[in-house]
């Protein structure tokens, strides 16, 4: 009974909305600006059916044509946020929320079950990807303005003591056309994924009774992009400024040791403390132990335990000295140099005992969790293969949702482009 009443109320509401919109068909006189500085002339009234949260609604709008541009437009469409769209802003918002959360077909099913609106999975996905890309364009434009210093974000209210930016990357499965000609890690040497770079910014104001840092609840914000490192750096810098970098007492960059991460950190936040994720460093140490296992024999575990203690203390010179006591030749010698180079290069970022004494995080678990929760749970499901634009759109939606900024997407001014 209640669902039947809901259906009836939706139908009734759709009729009311249709009548309300009919009161202003958007006639703006015999001529109106086409958006490119020309005069578009009134032609006639034309009907357009748009999907809304109250079902399909048909509106008769004044239609103008610009002879110089060669295209038509309905001013009323731009005012309603439906220019070039087949869905209302309200329905697009609903569709995008479903599409960022679950696969498109399931999302369409959720919209049908929860709102009584019928959409195909393809239509839902197409609109969600487009709205995500539009949101990404706004974010990128804002980041460029911050980089150019034409926009200066105000520091957040209640400035935290410590701000962290943790950085990582993960592969997203792609359609063959998106990876053609790219080298990969598979046996055939072909790429099947494209790397998406992810940054997670979060704050900290206290430590627990044992002195371990505690992330402030609900303080994480995310950004993700397929752009090269330079583009990612611009976005990361803007997010850092928005979160208070330059005003907080302590800014820390966390990463896995990749050179591009530290290059960006030094470029955009030279004042920041740089820390290599301790757990990545431990993985490298275990790889070093495997490399030397044939020489260590039954002393392997004892030797590795000693080096682990040195790593946890940040005593990288002692670790390097212990490893260099072994004389290797040929390929093994080169592998040892590479393994030790990781610790040599990152030694200033591995002062873990000192960092912990300062109450700082030494692990990048937040961004690794983000790679799984924000990216993997939606874009890396079985059988999925994305286009870069499609994946980028959904990623933007997911980052905004995970960052608590969902409403910001829908606060942008409506498009002024010609109507479809």
Model-inferred region functions:
Residues 1-41:
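A broadly conserved sequence feature marking short terminus-proximal activation segments
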Residues 1-17, 61-420:
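Catalytic center-proximal scaffold of phosphoryl-transfer enzymes
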Residues 28, 42-45, 59-60:
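A short, compositionally biased
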Residues 30-33, 49, 65:
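The −1 position to Zn-ligating cysteines in a subset of zinc-ribbon hairpins
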Residues 34-38, 53-55, 67-71:
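Short Cys/His-rich metal-coordination motifs, predominantly Zn2+-binding knuckles/fingers
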Residues 40-42, 75-76:
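Short, non-ligating residues that shape and space the ligands of small metal-coordination modules
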Residues 50-61:
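Short linker/helix segments within small regulatory modules
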């Amino acid at each position: 009974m209640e669902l039947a009443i809901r259906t009836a109320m939706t139908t009734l509401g759709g009729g009311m909305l249709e009548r309300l919109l009919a009161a202003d068909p958007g006639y703006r006189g015999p001529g109106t600006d086409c958006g490119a500085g020309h005069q578009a002339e009134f032609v006639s009234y034309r009907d357009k059916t748009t999907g809304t949260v109250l079902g399909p609604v048909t509106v008769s709008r004044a239609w103008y044509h610009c002879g110089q541009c060669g295209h038509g437009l309905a001013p009323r469409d731009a005012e309603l946020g439906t220019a070039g769209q087949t869905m209302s802003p309200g329905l697009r918002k609903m569709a995008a929320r479903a599409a960022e959360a679950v696969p498109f077909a399931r999302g369409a099913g959720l919209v049908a079950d929860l709102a009584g609106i019928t959409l195909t999975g393809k239509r839902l996905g197409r609109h969600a990807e487009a709205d995500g890309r539009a949101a990404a364009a706004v974010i990128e434009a804002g980041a460029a303005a911050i980089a150019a210093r034409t926009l200066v974000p105000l520091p957040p209210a209640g400035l935290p003591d410590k701000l962290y930016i943790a950085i990582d990357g993960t592969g997203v499965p792609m359609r063959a056309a998106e990876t053609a000609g790219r080298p990969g890690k598979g046996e055939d040497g072909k790429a099947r994924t494209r790397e998406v770079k992810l940054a997670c910014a979060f704050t900290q104001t206290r430590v627990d009774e044992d002195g371990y840092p505690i992330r402030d609840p609900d303080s994480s914000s995310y950004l993700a992009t397929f752009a090269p490192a330079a583009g990612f750096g611009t976005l990361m810098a803007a997010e850092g400024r928005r979160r208070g970098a330059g005003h907080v007492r302590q800014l820390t960059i966390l990463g896995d040791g990749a050179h591009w991460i530290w290059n960006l950190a030094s470029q955009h936040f030279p004042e920041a403390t740089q820390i290599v994720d301790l757990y990545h460093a431990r993985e490298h140490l275990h790889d070093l132990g495997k490399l030397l296992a044939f020489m260590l024999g039954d002393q392997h575990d004892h030797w590795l335990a000693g080096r682990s203690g040195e790593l946890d203390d940040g005593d990288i010179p002692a670790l390097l000295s212990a490893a260099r006591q072994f004389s290797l030749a040929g390929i093994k010698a080169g592998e040892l140099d590479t393994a030790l180079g990781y610790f040599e290069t990152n030694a200033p970022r591995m002062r873990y005992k000192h960092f912990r004494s300062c109450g700082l995080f030494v692990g990048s678990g937040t961004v690794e969790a983000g790679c799984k929760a924000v990216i993997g749970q939606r874009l890396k499901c079985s059988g999925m293969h994305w286009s870069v634009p499609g994946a980028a759109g959904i990623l933007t939606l997911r980052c905004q949702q995970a960052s608590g900024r969902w409403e910001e997407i829908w606060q942008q001014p409506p498009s002024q482009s010609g109507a479809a």
